[in-house]
Amino acid sequence: MATINDNYLKLKAGYLFPEIARRVNAFAEANPDAKIIRLGIGDVTEPLPEACRTAMIQAVEEMGDRSSFKGYGPEQGYAWLREKIATQDFQARGADVDASEIFISDGSKCDTGNILDIFGDNNIIAVTDPVYPVYVDTNVMAGHTGVANDKGEFEGLVYLPVTAENNFTAEIPSQKVDLIYLCFPNNPTGATATKEHLQAWVDYAKAHNSIIFFDAAYESYITDPSLPHSIYEIEGAREVAIEFRSFSKNAGFTGTRCALTVVPKTLKAKAADGSDVELWKLWNRRQSTKFNGVSYIVQRGAEAVYSEAGQAQVKALVSFYLDNAKIIREKLTAAGLSVYGGVNAPYVWVKTPNGLSSWDFFDKLLQTVNVVGTPGSGFGAAGEGYFRISAFNSRENVEEAMQRITEKFKL
C-alpha cells in the first residue's frame, strides 16, 4: 500500500483561517439574518488599479493575435518586469539588487514554503512568536520539527517571543540558529523594524553563517522615512538574506497572483562536503524544474504598477487601507482597549479585555456584534490574549464594525 508523509499528521486539525471560516459559516447558518463584517483574513477588498486592469486587457488582446501571442514564458519572470522592480523598488532606495536576482512567482506564501526545498533537513530554525502560521506549518510538513506540545509549540523550532515588553520585536537569540524568519512590517502584530534592529540581525547572521528569510509583503505600508523597506538597505544583507515581496497588498493582487523573491548571487550556504554553494543557482534550478512561471497577462498587470499612473493608484490604495487602520486604532483605543500596530502596517494588534482568551474573544465578538477578527493564539502561544484586526475592508464596513464594537460590545 502507498504511504503518506506522516509529518502532515503533526499539524493541528485545521489551518488557522479555515478554522475561522468554519466557525463563521456555522454562525451564519444558525443566524441567516446577521450581517457579518469580516476583519479577519488579510484579503483586500478594493478593485485593481486602473493602470493594471488596462495593461492586462491589452495583454489579453495580444494573446488573441498570432503575431503577439505568448506561450511559455521564462520561469524567472520576464526581464522587463524584473528590471522595473530592481530599479524602482530596490535601487531607488540604495539597495543593491540586480534584475537577474529577482524571481517572479505566484505568491510570497508559496515562496516562503518552497524555499525550504533548497535547504537541508538539519538546520536549526528560528521563528518569532506570534508568527505567520505558514512559516511553521511548512517546516512541519518538510519534517523539520518534532511534535507539538500543549501550547502548540513544535519540538525542534526556536521560538522568539515578541511582546508588548519588547515592543513586539524579537531579541537576538543567545544560541546559534541557521534559518531565521523575519517579517516587517509584521504580520500579525503590525510592528516595524528600524535599520539598527535589522543591522543587529544581519550582524548575527554573518557571525553564525545563518540565513534570514525576510518577508516584506507589507513594505508599501511604511510611511515613516526612517524605516527600511528592504533588508538589502542594510549593510552586509546580501551575504545573509533572501527577501520575499508581493503585489497582493499594495496593488490588490490577492486574486490575480504575482509576487517576487530576491536571491542575491553573493548568498551561499554549505553543502554536505563542506563546500560553499550559491543559493541563486539552487533556487533557479528549483524554479525551472517545479514552476512554469507567472502568466504573461498577470506580469503585464504587475509591470503597470511601476508606471506613473500605477504608482499614484497604488499609493491611493495603500493610503485607503492605512486610513482604515487609523480608524480602527482610534476607535478601539477610545473604547479602552490596549492597541498596537496599525501605523506603517495594515494590521491592528489588540489585547483582549478582562482576561478573555483569544478564541473566547473571537466568539464573543462574532456572537454579540457579528464582527470577525483573528485570534492571536492562532499565530502562536505568545499570541494568546491578543486579537488581530485587519484594515482590509471597505470604509463603510470598517466604520460600522467599529461603531458596533464601541456602542454594543461590553468590554
Curated annotation (Swiss-Prot):
The N6-(pyridoxal phosphate)lysine modification is found at K249
Reactions mediated catalytically? (2S,6S)-2,6-diaminopimelate + 2-oxoglutarate = (S)-2,3,4,5-tetrahydrodipicolinate + L-glutamate + H2O + H(+)
In which pathway does this enzyme or protein participate? Amino-acid biosynthesis; L-lysine biosynthesis via DAP pathway; LL-2,6-diaminopimelate from (S)-tetrahydrodipicolinate (aminotransferase route): step 1/1
Which residues participate in pyridoxal 5'-phosphate binding? Answer: Y72, S108, K109, Y132, N187, Y218, S246, F247, S248, R257, N292
For this chain's UniProt record, which GO biological process terms are given?
Answer: lysine biosynthetic process via diaminopimelate, diaminopimelate-aminotransferase pathway
Q: Where is the signal peptide?
A: none
Q: Supply the EC number(s).
A: 2.6.1.83
The entry's substrate-binding residues are Y15, G42, K109, Y132, N187, N292, R388
> Which protein family is it in?
Belongs to the class-I pyridoxal-phosphate-dependent aminotransferase family. LL-diaminopimelate aminotransferase subfamily.
PANTHER family linked: AMINOTRANSFERASE
Q: What does this protein do?
A: Involved in the synthesis of meso-diaminopimelate (m-DAP or DL-DAP), required for both lysine and peptidoglycan biosynthesis. Catalyzes the direct conversion of tetrahydrodipicolinate to LL-diaminopimelate.
NCBIfam families membership: DAPAT_plant
Partners and quaternary state? Homodimer.
What name has this protein been given in UniProt? LL-diaminopimelate aminotransferase 1
Gene transcribed to yield this protein: dapL1
